[in-house]
Amino acid sequence: MIYRFLLLVMLITVGFPRPLKAEVTTDGTILIITSYNPETRSISDNLSAFMDEYKLRGGKRLITIESMNCKNLSEAHLWKERMASILEKYERTAAPSLIILLGQEAWASFISQNSEIAKKTPAMCGMVSANTVVLPEDSVDLVKWSPDSKDIFKDFPDYNIVSGYVYQYNVDKNIELMRRFYPNMKKVAFISDNTYGGLSMQAFVKKEMKKYPELELMLLDGRTSSFLEVSERIRHLSNDVCVLVGTWRIDCTENYVMGNTTYMLRDANPTLPVFTIASVGLGHWALGGYTPVYHKVGKEIAGATYNFLDGETGSETGVVPVPGNYVFDVKRMHQFGLDSINLLKVLS
């Protein structure tokens, strides 16, 4: 079911601060489309930050919120139509002055549209990766699907993307990190789960690994393997393999895995060197990695929204990459005999 929320209803429903009672204008409505129900914590936190900042800056435009209510990857063939239905509704009534997409699934569904409202209306995005995949036709088997990775900075010139805050995953820096510590590495095992985010990240890693023909890429794919099957494969990985963890929430059974399953994966092969590209496994399994600095982007998007719609110059912020940094688990590194001198070499 697709939910539609007006700003006043939304603020009351999920406990946001009291709404503006005066000087709200319906001219140039802002349409926010989320991947999940707005009561989901990650969505709620970003919406709350957006509302607070937009109000603080003096924004007075009516904000309408729609949820695509996305769930498992197996229903991805439905997302394009859900997005089309939302956009058609506004195209028939009053087209918004700005569309904001929050979440990977909403963003992918939007850039998979060919309608005039999708391509011409100014758009912003948040809670998304700089690299994505365009949704397939209904007939595609999602378990076997091997999509091309697309880059928001290069591949969508026919869309009116005026701003966004995107996470950039850096395969090169993680390969360099692995080689600093394990110069004899010959294989990289990449772990991804049965989600759109996992598939999108896998497509990007496959694309980037073409730069390293001397390294064999092994895919531990939650679309085709259960937790137990992935665990068994990890158990038998050889000592010339480094693991790069992407995402791990849902396996092929479409059941959400518990947080402690990464502990069990660790215990399946305790001496296996593991790194992370997205912070998954830090604190108990991964030695470290180069990852985005995750944070709520609602405030920044509100600022970009106000500047674009209400600022004196109508300025476009452009798509902004969220910074990344190196993160390490010093305790795990000591357990593997990797000392601080090696750390300094990496960061120099």
Where are the regions a protein language model picked out?
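N-terminal secretory signal peptides that target proteins for export/translocation
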Residues: M1-I2
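Cleavable N-terminal signal peptides
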Residues: V9, P19-L20
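Sec-dependent N-terminal signal peptides
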Residues: F5-T13
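N-terminal signal peptide c-region/cleavage motif recognized by signal peptidases
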Residues: G15-P17
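Short hydrophobic alpha-helices and adjacent helix-cap/hinge residues
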Residues: L20-S348
